[in-house]
Amino acid sequence: MQVSVEATQGLERRLTISVPAEQIEKLVKDSLQREAKRARIPGFRPGKVPVTVINKRYGAAIRQDITGEVMQRNFIEAIIAEKLNPAGAPTFIPGSTDSEKFEFVATFEIYPEVELKGLDAIEVEQPKASVTDADVDSMIETLRKQHATYAAVEREAADGDKVKMNFVGSVDGEEFEGGKAEDFELQLGSGRMIPGFEAGILGHKAGEEFVIDVNFPEEYHAENLKGKAAKFAITLTEVQAANLPEVNDEFAALFGINEGGLEALKTEIRKNMNRELEQALKANVKEQVIAGLLANNDIELPKALIDGEVNVLRQQAMQRFGGQTANMPELPAELFTEQAARRVKIGLLLGEVIKTNELKAEDERVQGLIASMASAYEDPSEVIAYYNSNKELMQNMRNVALEEQAVEALLKSAKVTEKEVAFEEFMNKATGRA
């Protein structure tokens, strides 16, 4: 086998490989003979079909298969010999064939050489938060509201009430599409409607008819309504006030707490809040570390890896539509290219961190991650056993553990400052509610 390597552009490489023609001819001959022994062709006894007949019928297909196998095998031998690391499947182009040699070209991309830079310039503001008694009480109040019952009242509508209404919206005296509704239910303070709409209902009683003036936001989804002043003629048909359940052992039973009553519920709530806080704190620090790593390291990305990641993201997006994808056109790659490139870059950089620091997934950490995830389920031991018996899930957890270890390695050289934050403030920002 003879090999020449050419760097074409960027990460692309072109291998020109020559193999002795007799190697292919021998493989073709052997394959034809094997086929002759097992072929069943009318007019010939089993195992007695002449090779010339087999060659006439199947020769072209057999030669094509053998050629493909030869190219694949010699390509692998060539990249090992040349110490090349392909970042995707090669494209084979069969070339000239004469009595002495068969030549073909393999084109592919290689992984970039990654040299980590600016690790000591990464800046991280590490939040410090804890779950207080007041935070637990606030969560219980939220749970009370979620389990509230509503009853009609003969008073003015207030924040937190549910109301029923009929309304007709107009712009410049003309009704607009989607601006009319009957028996419309709305919880005041939910923020579901455009600014000013809910506030305009406060202080009104059931049976009242009134008009409120509002302005559609400039970023409103309907082009014809962006930034427009509008009037809504409203007939308020019902005002309902919330009746919150008392906080006692019966309240605890609503959440499956059958022993220990209210104190057991508070313990469970605190445990869940601590778990969510720990996950959010880790995610916040990781996000900052990754952002710094990306900002300080510019590397060339193999298109093959980006294309592969685009396909993964596209598939995930299609799955979110459930069974409604049969008649949908394929989502364009451009929708996912930027996110895919970012994910590929993160993977390559973290891979280099893992390699440089000789990191291996710590078993104790892996089991800790599984236990933390399983604690959210009714029977954690069953979930833990399921993960430990599933190779794919365990590999996913090892990858998560390795990422954590890589982030921790980067933190050692980063500029880290600690900042005390309140639980509610931090979690609102983490979940996008701030």
UniProtKB/Swiss-Prot annotation:
The keyword ATP-binding does not apply. Pfam families: FKBP_C, Trigger_C, Trigger_N. It is found in: Cytoplasm. GO terms for cellular component: cytoplasm. It is an enzyme of class 5 (isomerase). It catalyses: [protein]-peptidylproline (omega=180) = [protein]-peptidylproline (omega=0). Its main location: cytoplasm. GO terms for biological process: 'de novo' cotranslational protein folding; cell division; chaperone-mediated protein folding; protein transport; protein unfolding. InterPro entries: PPIase_dom_sf, PPIase_FKBP_dom, Trig_fac, Trigger_fac_C, Trigger_fac_C_sf, Trigger_fac_ribosome-bd_bac, Trigger_fac_ribosome-bd_sf, Trigger_fact/SurA_dom_sf. Residues 160-245 form the PPIase FKBP-type domain. Keywords: Cell cycle, Cell division, Chaperone, Cytoplasm, Isomerase, Rotamase. Its EC number is 5.2.1.8. GO terms for molecular function: peptidyl-prolyl cis-trans isomerase activity; protein folding chaperone; ribosome binding. It comes from the Bacteria. NCBIfam families: tig. Involved in protein export. Acts as a chaperone by maintaining the newly synthesized protein in an open conformation. Functions as a peptidyl-prolyl cis-trans isomerase. Belongs to the FKBP-type PPIase family. Tig subfamily. Consists of 3 domains; the N-terminus binds the ribosome, the middle domain has PPIase activity, while the C-terminus has intrinsic chaperone activity on its own. This is Trigger factor. It comes from Shewanella putrefaciens (strain CN-32 / ATCC BAA-453).
